[in-house]
Amino acid sequence: MLIAPLFGFIDRNVTFFFGLGVAFLILRGSDFDWGRFGIGRKITGKTVLKSLIITLVLFIVFHVFVDTLLQNWLGEYDLSSVEDVEGNLVGYVVLMVIIWIFAAFGEEFLFRGYYMKALAELLGNNNKDWILSAIITSLYFGISHIYQGLSGAVAVFLWSLTISLIFNKNRNNLVLLILIHGFYDSIGITMIFLNSDFGISEWALNLLT
């Protein structure tokens, strides 16, 4: 966790894949003990339903309120890295696959399953240590998304902190976080593909200003 950010001066993807590579080496060294990274439960219907409900709540809170306010105060998000997917079905499908493999699974495995869990255990492994770890790793996660602009980085930090606090209550169920992350990003990419947020942002801005 301390070394990986240094690669950010080269390329942000190098930072991510270096950390992910280290995490997988540790996983291999533990004889693939997935429970060490918080993956101690299988996917169940209850977990899927719970993830869908949480995703819906997060979408309402963030897209309708948090995102609207941040963009009004700090400027719009820089989504140029994914704007090519607009109206592009092939690009949309490819990006969906990438999202579920590298964003949903990869980022949750690395940031929550490895960074947050390992740091919390290093600090003392009590509830306060887990919360402190959630804040620290979420700051790191937010900064790693600075390419989305200041408003984007702040939004990602707040979203990551929320997700991390959920993980604190479900320390043996990282699958729940993976599903939430995947569903949430899928909604966002679908909206970009359709070039529409169905009037939600305009309605929210009028409501909040």
Question: Where are the regions that the model predicts?
Answer:
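Juxtamembrane helix-loop-helix connectors linking adjacent transmembrane helices
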Residues: 34-103, 121-124, 197-209
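Membrane-embedded alpha-helical segments of multi-pass transporters/permeases
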Residues: 24, 63-64, 189-193
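Short alpha-helical transmembrane interface motifs in multi-pass membrane proteins
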Residues: 7, 18-19, 50, 63, ...
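Alpha-helical transmembrane segments
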Residues: 1-4, 51-58, 134-136
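Juxtamembrane/transmembrane-helix boundary motifs at the membrane-water interface
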Residues: 2-11, 75, 193-204
